[in-house]
Amino acid sequence: MKADLVVGIQWGDEGKGKIVDSMASAYDVVVRYQGGHNAGHTIVVDGKKIALHLIPSGILYADCKNVIGNGVVVNPEALLKEMKQFEALEGRLFVSDKAHMILPYHEMLDQAREKLMEERAIGTTGKGIGPAYSDKISRNGIRMGELRDIPKLVEKIMEYQEAHAYLSDIYGVKLLGREEITERMSDYAKRLLPFIVDTTKLLWDAMDRGQRILLEGAQGSMLDIDHGTYPFVTSSTTTASGACSGTGLAPKHIGEVVGIAKAYCTRVGNGPFPTEDFGSEGNLLREKGKEFGTTTGRPRRCGWFDAIAVRHACRLNGCENLALMKLDVLDGFPEVKVCVAYLYEGKEIDYIPYDCEGVTPVYKSFAGWDHSEGIREFDALPKSAKEYVLEIEKITGARVSIISTGPDRKDTIRR
C-alpha cells in the first residue's frame, strides 16, 4: 500500500484543506509533513468554518489518525490552542518526537528581522518559522522529544540563549529567564507528552498493516526553498520530495500526487507574481474570493491563472491529476484569462526563467460565465467554464479530476 499526497502547486492558499477533508474519510492516517503554524486551512462543514494551522484535516473524522511529522516545526502554544477545538484527541493525534520546536525568541527574531529589512523584507507571517528551521539546520534546534527531560532541556535552552545574547542587542529580542523557561516547558510536557511519539515507526507500522495514508502539504510549490521564487520563499521543502524527508517514508512508498490550484492565482507577502492584477479585476477577485490570510488576515495579492507556473509545479511534483479550486469565484466576470506564455528579454517563452521578476504574462482570453456555484457535474457547467478547464489541462499536461464550485464539502465536481 502506497501513501497518496496532496500538494499545493501555486503560492499557497490553494484550498488544500477542503480537498484533504473530502478525501480523508477514505484514509486511516492523515499526515502533515512540513511547515508550521504559518500555514492555514479553512474547512467548511455544514456551514461551520474550522481553521487548522498544524493539526491535519483528518481530525474531523473520528476513526482517522492524524500525524504531525518530523518535518514540521511546532509552536507548542499554537498547537495547544488548536487542540482546544476538539475533544478526545488521545489515540487520534500524534506529534513526532523529532519535530523541532518554535520558541518565543524565534518569533521575536522573525519579526525583528522583517522590520529591519524594510523594502527587502520577505513578507513572512512573523511566526518564527524561518528562525526555527535555521536552528534546525545549524544543529542548534530543540525537538519535541526533549520535553521528556525538563532539567536537561532547560539547560540546553539557557546555553543557547547565552551563546546568542547578541540577538538581544542587535534585534531587541527578549530572552527568557530560567524560571520562565522551566515553567513553560513543564507545562508543555504535562499537556503534550501523551501525544509525542516516534511517528516514523507509527507510519511504517500502519503501512505494514495495509492502512491507507494521506500526506498533506502546507503552503505551495512556488514557495519551495529550492524551487520557489527565491529568496521570497518559505524555509521548508513544499514540493512532493519534502513528504519523504518530513515523514520517514521512502520515495517508493509514495503513490498518487494530487496537485491543488485555484482557478486564479493569489500570493501573500513579497516576491515575483507574474499575473498579479493591480486594478479592478484583482480587487474583485480578492473581494469575491474572500482572499485574506487564514493566519495573518492580510489581503492576498490576486491575479489570473498562471498555467506556466502550474505546469512547472506539476513537473516538480509528478502531478498527473489536479484539483481546481474556487471556479465559482470567476462567475460574473465578462472575460477570464489564462497565462499561456511569458515575454522575457524580448522573446516568448513557456518556462520559468531564473529571473522570474522580469517576465510579462501572455494571456489567452475566454468569455465569462454567469453561474458555476454549487454545480456538481462537469457537463452541467457553462460552456465557457468547461473550455477554461480544458485549456488548463492542455497547457499543464495534467487532468483536472476535481473542481470546487463552492466552500462546502458537497460543492465539488469529480471527473
Curated annotation (Swiss-Prot):
Binding site for IMP: 13-16, 38-41, 125, 139, 219, 234, 298
GO cellular component assignments: cytoplasm
Subcellular location: Cytoplasm
Binding site for Mg(2+): 13, 40
MF terms in GO: adenylosuccinate synthase activity; GTP binding; magnesium ion binding
EC class name: ligase
HAMAP family referenced in this protein's UniProt entry, alphabetically: Adenylosucc_synth
Xref: PANTHER family: ADENYLOSUCCINATE SYNTHETASE (PTHR11846:SF0)
Family under the similarity heading: Belongs to the adenylosuccinate synthetase family.
Protein name: Adenylosuccinate synthetase
